[in-house]
Amino acid sequence: MKIVHSILITVIALVAFYIQIDNPVYIFQFYLSVLTFCFLFGAINKEPNICHISLMLAFIAVAEYSLFATGVIDLGQHDDNYLIIGTIVFGLQLLINIFAVLLFVFRIQISRFFSSSSKIILTDFDGLFHWLFIAAGVVNILALIENSLRNALGWHSLTFIYDTYEIYGYAIIALTCGLLLTMLILKVKNRQLT
């Protein structure tokens, strides 16, 4: 089996795993453990690019989780105005996605600011991570539009994004894990060839 097939199967399995768990706390913990593994791999093998990408992803995940899971951002009660709550929640997640896109677009400059390592280079994967957050941003824009149509205009049957929102998030997390694991596999494979 080729590496590409293994990675594709891993990503699909992770999406299915996340959907079955359907618990943000457990998924967050699992995601952080994957990021920690990747960070440790990068640190042990002196690969600052992997370390920095893992740290950036962890920073974004912890920031988002801290805002929503700890109650800093109120997810609303039964009798709240869902238009306002949804706009705040999806709007804040859109802002986090925009921040993440900028973080990964300027990843090299940020990495060089914090480290003087000569190994900090543009990797083949630097052009991919920000696209995951662009995709997440598009989902958040669609969620904002749907929230406005449903709660401001009374289109209460319009719930496609709302019903599948977590699945999109799980897929993006799984793709992120897949990209990181691919980076690790290629580093190991390239090291064996040299």
Tell me what each language-model feature is.
Residues 1-5, 46-57, 129-132:
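Membrane-interfacial loop-to-transmembrane alpha-helix junctions, especially the N-terminal start
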Residues 1-8, 166-168:
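N-terminal membrane topogenic signal
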Residues 99-194:
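C-terminal membrane-adjacent module
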Residues 8-17, 31-41:
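Hydrophobic, membrane-inserted alpha-helices
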Residues 33-43, 59-65, 95:
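Alpha-helical transmembrane segments and their membrane-interface exit regions
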Residues 61-129:
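Membrane-proximal helix-loop-helix units in multi-pass membrane proteins
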Residues 15-21, 66-79, 145-157:
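Juxtamembrane "helix-exit" motif on the non-cytosolic side of transmembrane helices
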